[in-house]
Amino acid sequence: MTNSAASDQEPVFIEVGEGDGRRRIAVRAREGAGPGLFWLGGFNSDMKGTKALALDAWAAEQGRACVRFDYSGHGESGGAFVDGTIGRWLEESVAVFERFCL
């Protein structure tokens, strides 16, 4: 990963869940010093929203790591919003954190 501008970053996709509950989750992660930022979007928001982009830009300027992702049914991730549940979105959050933040 590079310290390119937020708009230049291409998403990486990971698979979360099993069987029919499997979802394709879009993630944008930049390496940097810690502590880093882990963006958890709000209800019906996505990682390309103004707040997420502002935090990513700050992280880039400060040399901090930053991880943003879209929950299933949001932004660049797969799935339909109506199929989303708090449990699914929690599972996605944990999977992204474990893959990109540890």
Annotate the PLM regions.
Residues 49-50, 77-81:
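Conserved catalytic-core motifs of eukaryotic protein kinase domains, centered on the activation segment
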Residues 54-78:
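Conserved alpha/beta-hydrolase
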Residues 83-101:
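Alpha/beta-hydrolase active-site loop
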Residues 44, 79-85:
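Short glycine-enriched, charge-decorated loop/helix-capping segments at active-site entrances
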Residues 43-56:
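The serine-hydrolase catalytic nucleophile loop
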Residues 31-32, 100-102:
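Glycine-rich phosphate-binding loop signature in dinucleotide/nucleotide-binding domains
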Residues 34-43:
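Short beta-strand element of the alpha/beta-hydrolase
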